[in-house]
Amino acid sequence: MSSKKMVNSVEGCAGDALAGFVACNPDLQLLQGYRVALRSDLDSLKGRVALLSGGGSGHEPAHAGFIGKGMLTGVIAGAVFASPAVGSILAAIRAVAQAGTAGTLLIVKNYTGDRLNFGLAMEQAKAEGISVEMVVIEDDSAFTVLKKAGRRGLCGTILIHKVAGALAEEGMGLEEITKKVSVIAKAIGTLGVSLSPCSVPGTKPTFELAADEMELGLGIHGEAGVRRIKLVPVDQIVTLMLDHMTDTSNISHVPVKSGSSVVLMVNNLGGLSFLELGIIADAAIRLLEGRGVKVARALVGTFMSALEMRGVSLTLMLVDEPLLKLIDAETNAKAWPHMSKVSVTGRNRIRAAPTEPAEAPEATAAGGVASKQMTLVLDRISTTLIGLEEHLNALDRAAGDGDCGSTHSRAAKAIQGWLKEGPTPASPAQVLSKLSVLLLEKMGGSSGALYGLFLTAAAQPLKANTDLPAWSAAMDAGLKAMQKYGKAAPGDRTMLDSLWAAAQELQAWKSPGASLLPVLTKAVKSAEAAAEATKNMEAGAGRASYISSAQLDQPDPGAVAAAAIFRAILEVLQTKAA
């Protein structure tokens, strides 16, 4: 069965994709009758060398994304994973020659079809008296024994686009550019790894990988790599890649060693998330620096893809200062990243954390009866939430991402860890403030933020008094802050429903002669009833608000958790009173 693709037709997808890119970029034009994109300011290139590249489609943004001042003059696109037609290549050469350029350099990836078709077009152009040269890029570092076809052309080709473009922009001649980039290309190595295959529109995937497997050294068309291995953490993957790329017994290795200076490219092969790319980039830089390699520049993104392949390639290019200047030279090519002209290695990547405001000594005093009671309450709350983890997760799966219990359990374990550090502060306001900071840092998600808001606001009325009216006022203040920023209201099927119900009962604490436990008992029962009632509500806030009410037939997990917290508090205070 072929994979799903968003195309108009299999036959027309390459042309449609190129047309869409040109339509969105006024600096580009299509060459009438051909699948060719060119700079729209060709006339400004009179007397300068033109640079043409291309190949099969399906590797976007390569190569059209790298057309622009300081990079390519134009590209010729073949069908998906197919070499461009000789006629299209020749038409592109003629177009730039007729614009008055001082010769054309063809930058070609090392694949048989590309070499043949670009080579034939070059010979025909030369026969017409046009000055044309060709460089073939072979940067694949996968194969330890050189094959007759040579090394494949991979993402390192993009760096040659950049270097050649900068040289052409300086006004260097065709012969000299050709010689320089031919030498530079020999100091580039690329290696890929993937978790999945890719599939040409209208066809089945190019190969199969088990769920726990990945393939090392595969090509950008799904060609076989050097071996399959079990899925391991990113640090191990990157270590394996760097070891393979720099192993001197590997005929296709890149000669990077301690003391070398490199440009690093972390290239998404199509289907990785930016989250994964960031993790891989972090590992690559750490591990290179750990080997004594200076990372002069780092590029992270999608440069040469393989359709939807869930993989990454790493490219290393040995550089010196003159070569870095060419990498840093200005370009307006849409797919080239805007990089700082500063070395990655040697830069201080950590800024000192801001200092905490000084606390009044009386606010931080610990120990005493109140402190011990607060410790018992917090310990019971923590134990309760940890015990409810699976139940809350199950409730959350119907309307959220199924992690409400895990989130509350994470908060509970953080509180337990804090309690082990020593006695809690004697001041309830200080306890709530510290809990707020702890939950914001450790709990995470919207729940952490909402509890953080609630506790921060609730702490304020308790700074002056800690009697029952002050605790009722603290509840009111916390709810007000939660509503202000969370945008939830009673009846929206959130934790606020339980908290609001409890708060209404706690208003009785503001009356003269009010008792602690009778009022709190009513508050707990109201909170539990409100939590149970949420299963009949339509969600008005949070992720559940995007779910049909017909699917919401269980209580809201946040409301259940809030009610359980009140029940835990009551149980501790009842035990103390007994």
From Swiss-Prot:
Residues modified as Phosphoserine: S511, S545
Cofactors, names only: Mg(2+); Mn(2+); Co(2+)
Ranges where the DhaK domain occurs: 9-336
DhaL domain sequence ranges: 372-571
Record-listed ATP binding positions: D401, G402, D403, C404, S446, S447, G486, T494, M495, D556, P557, G558
Top-level taxon in the UniProt lineage: Eukaryota
Record-level Gene Ontology MF annotations: ATP binding; FAD-AMP lyase (cyclizing) activity; glycerone kinase activity; metal ion binding; triokinase activity
Activity regulation behaviour: Each activity is inhibited by the substrate(s) of the other.
InterPro entries xrefs: DhaK_ATP, DhaK_dom, DhaL_dom, DhaL_dom_sf, Dihydroxyacetone_Kinase
An annotated GO cellular component: cytosol
Keywords, alphabetical: ATP-binding, Cobalt, FAD, Flavoprotein, Kinase, Lyase, Magnesium, Manganese, Metal-binding, Multifunctional enzyme, Nucleotide-binding, Phosphoprotein, Transferase
Xref: PROSITE patterns: DHAK, DHAL
GO biological process: carbohydrate metabolic process; carbohydrate phosphorylation; fructose catabolic process to hydroxyacetone phosphate and glyceraldehyde-3-phosphate; glycerol catabolic process; negative regulation of MDA-5 signaling pathway; regulation of innate immune response
Active-site residues (renumbered): H221 (tele-hemiaminal-histidine intermediate)
Disulphide bridges: none
Pfam families per record: Dak1 (PF02733), Dak2 (PF02734)
Cofactor info, note text: Manganese or cobalt are requested for FAD-AMP lyase activity.
Binding site for dihydroxyacetone: G56, S57, G58, H59, K109, D114
Catalytic activity: dihydroxyacetone + ATP = dihydroxyacetone phosphate + ADP + H(+); D-glyceraldehyde + ATP = D-glyceraldehyde 3-phosphate + ADP + H(+); FAD = riboflavin cyclic-4',5'-phosphate + AMP + H(+)
Homology family: Belongs to the dihydroxyacetone kinase (DAK) family.
Quaternary data: Homodimer. Interacts with IFIH1 (via the CARD domains), the interaction is inhibited by viral infection.
Free-text comment on this protein's domains from its UniProt entry: DhaK and DhaL domains have differential roles, individually DhaK is inactive and DhaL displays cyclase but not kinase activity.
Function, in words: Catalyzes both the phosphorylation of dihydroxyacetone and of glyceraldehyde, and the splitting of ribonucleoside diphosphate-X compounds among which FAD is the best substrate. Represses IFIH1-mediated cellular antiviral response.
Protein name in the entry: Triokinase/FMN cyclase
Organism: Rattus norvegicus
